[in-house]
A protein has these predicted regions:
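A generic secondary-structure signal
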Residues: 49, 80-84, 166-174
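Short secondary-structure transition/capping motifs
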Residues: 35-36, 48, 66-70, 117, ...
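Single, function-defining residue in the core of a domain
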Residues: 1-15, 104, 108, 139-141, ...
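Structural motif
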Residues: 19-27, 119-125, 319-329
Length: 341
């Protein structure tokens, strides 16, 4: 592969960022060019393949020693996205909260440990990041993240829920993302404190229920999967798909009275997985089709995780310094965003 002789044109908006000095901007452009176009996304690989890098040491110092604020950089990234119609957020958009585990091999990397990887269905050695992600009909990009670091004296679930609440506070109080609806997976939707935190800002939410979640029906509490065996579903069209649907306003454990929707996709394809979905939302009066369509947007964060790991170096940082690793992940989000402009 021939060396990359110039910074990618998508890095030009960095010239207007106030969080970086002139020389820091050059390093950032080099690093972003490497994340986007180099085969190896480490400092060593970028220095070898991107000629403006000067040296691996210079990039390492940029990540670990130079004085710049990655949080300010991130806010400037989000401000830049609002300058373009195709990436400007709106009330009709959605904020997705989810986490991702990046498998690693080193034992001295920041926050590395054993985490359950939902995409693999097993516990792996790696780093765990909790993300907020914006999406709507025209665009999709990350908003911010927190790294979860496992400690023996802490409850893993509660600590990760706390990080998610911190993210929501930042988005609502500092950034001001106008999206009216939050989307969760079953793990995050299990935390009543997180749900209440979203509702405290007057926002809506949609998330799946675990099959063992307790629902009050006929004056008794039963599992939602047991409820599914009792009820009669009605066949309805949602876009180009057919679902068998049942929905009612019901008390759910930890969530209070919410709209419960049980949906089973109808298909003639024997190879297509056809699980029953148990969804809940505080959008009590929302049509079933709206709830199903809304929740389908959650998949876009999975695409971001996949693209970031395969093509943009999400899991390639070898820096052992915590601040340096955080800066790498912020620059990776910036790379993803600039490539969409």
């Amino acid at each position: 592969m021939l060396p990359i002789t110039n910074h990618l044109s998508c890095t030009e908006p960095l010239d207007e960022f106030e969080s970086l000095s002139y020389h820091q901007t050059l390093h950032a452009k080099t690093y972003i060019t490497g994340l986007a176009a180099a085969r190896s996304k480490t400092c060593k690989g970028i220095a070898r393949e991107v000629l403006p890098a000067n040296s691996e040491r210079a990039l390492n110092k940029f990540l670990t020693e130079y004085d710049w604020d990655e949080k300010q950089l991130n806010h400037e990234r989000l401000e830049e996205l609002q300058n373009h119609g195709e990436t400007r957020w709106s009330q009709d958009g959605y904020i997705i909260i989810d986490d991702s585990v990046t498998q690693r091999t080193g034992e001295e990397l920041p926050g590395v440990g054993r985490f359950y990887d939902h995409s693999e269905g097993e516990t792996v050695w790696g780093q765990n990041l909790v993300y907020a992600f914006y999406t709507d009909d025209k665009t999709a990009y990350p908003l911010t993240f927190r790294q979860y670091e496992k400690r023996d004296d802490e409850d893993e679930d509660e600590t990760k829920y706390k990080l998610a609440r911190e993210i929501i506070t930042e988005l609502e109080d500092e950034v001001g993302v106008p999206a009216d609806t939050y989307l969760f997976d079953a793990w995050f939707a299990h935390d009543s404190g997180l749900i209440k935190h979203v509702e405290s800002y007057g926002k809506d939410w949609v998330g799946p229920l675990r099959s063992n979640r307790q629902v009050t029906y006929d004056n008794e509490e039963i599992r939602v999967d047991a409820l599914e065996e009792r009820i009669d579903k009605t066949e309805r069209e949602v876009d180009d798909d057919t679902y068998k649907i049942w929905t009612q306003k019901r008390p759910v454990s930890k969530l209070g009275e919410v709209k419960v929707l049980i949906a089973e996709k109808v298909t003639d394809d024997e190879d297509e997985e056809n699980p029953v979905k148990y969804l809940a939302t505080n959008k009590i009066d929302a049509p079933s089709a709206h709830v199903i369509r809304t929740y389908s947007y959650r998949w876009r964060i999975e695409t971001f995780f996949e693209d970031s790991k395969q093509d943009l170096g999400l899991g390639d940082c070898e820096v052992r310094d915590g601040e340096g690793a955080s800066r790498h992940w912020h620059l990776q989000m910036l790379t993803y965003s600039l490539l969409r402009l």
